[in-house]
C-alpha cells in the first residue's frame, strides 16, 4: 500500500523541468525568454525549457547590489538542440539598472580590479585571429554615467 501512496504523492507535485519560477525576473529579461520560447515553437512546434542555472544574480557594476544575468546556455528546445548555442558559445544577457548588454560567450565571470568590477567573457578563438581552441577573452567594465559596457580591443605593440 505504501508504494501506491508514494506514487500518488508524486503525481501531485508540479513538473520540475519547466517550473522555474520567473515571477521576479525583470521585464527586459522576461522578453528574452518569451522570444526564445516563440523561436523554439516555430521549429516544428518545439517545446521550450528554461533549465536550472539560467538566472544568476551578481554585482556587475560595483554598487553592492545584485544585478541580473540570463544565460541562454540553460535554454533548451526539444526540436532544435543548437538553436541557442553554437561553437561560438551562448548569449548571456547582463542587466544593470534598465540596460541589457547581450554578449555571446563560452563562459563568464566577474572580477574586482581595484574599485571596478570587470566582466570577463571567453570568446571563440576566431575573435582573436585563431580558431576554436585559441585562448580569447573580452574584458568589459560598466560605465555608470553613460550606462554602457566599455571595452577596448587589445593591440600588441
Predicted regions and their residues:
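Repeat-based blade/solenoid architectures
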Residues: 45-54, 101-113
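Mature extracytoplasmic domains of secretory-pathway proteins
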Residues: 65-66, 76-79, 84-94
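Short, flexible beta-strand-to-coil junctions
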Residues: 72-76, 96-98, 122-129
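N-terminal signal peptide c-region/cleavage motif recognized by signal peptidases
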Residues: 14-16
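Beta-propeller blade signature
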Residues: 87-97, 137-143
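Short consensus segments that form the blades of beta-propeller domains
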Residues: 45-46, 79-87, 127-132
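Acidic, small-residue rich beta-repeat scaffolds with periodic aromatic anchors
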Residues: 3-5, 18-32, 36-44, 108-157
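Acidic/hydrophobic-patterned starts of short beta strands in beta-sheet-rich repeat architectures
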Residues: 60-73, 113-124
Amino acid at each position: 500500500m505504501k508504494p501506491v501512496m508514494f506514487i500518488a504523492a508524486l503525481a501531485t507535485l508540479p513538473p520540475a523541468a519547466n517550473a522555474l519560477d520567473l515571477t521576479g525576473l525583470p521585464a527586459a529579461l522576461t522578453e528574452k525568454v518569451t522570444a526564445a520560447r516563440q523561436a523554439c515553437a516555430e521549429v516544428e512546434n518545439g517545446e521550450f525549457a528554461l533549465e536550472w542555472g539560467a538566472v544568476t544574480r551578481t554585482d556587475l557594476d560595483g554598487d553592492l547590489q545584485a544585478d541580473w544575468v540570463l544565460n541562454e546556455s540553460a535554454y533548451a528546445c526539444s526540436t532544435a538542440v543548437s538553436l541557442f548555442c553554437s561553437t561560438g558559445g551562448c548569449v548571456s544577457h547582463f542587466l544593470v539598472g534598465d540596460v541589457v548588454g547581450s554578449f555571446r560567450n563560452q563562459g563568464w565571470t566577474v572580477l574586482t580590479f581595484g574599485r571596478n568590477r570587470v566582466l570577463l567573457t571567453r570568446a571563440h578563438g576566431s575573435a582573436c585571429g585563431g580558431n576554436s581552441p585559441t585562448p580569447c577573452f573580452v574584458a568589459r567594465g560598466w560605465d555608470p554615467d553613460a550606462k554602457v559596457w566599455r571595452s577596448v580591443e587589445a593591440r600588441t605593440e
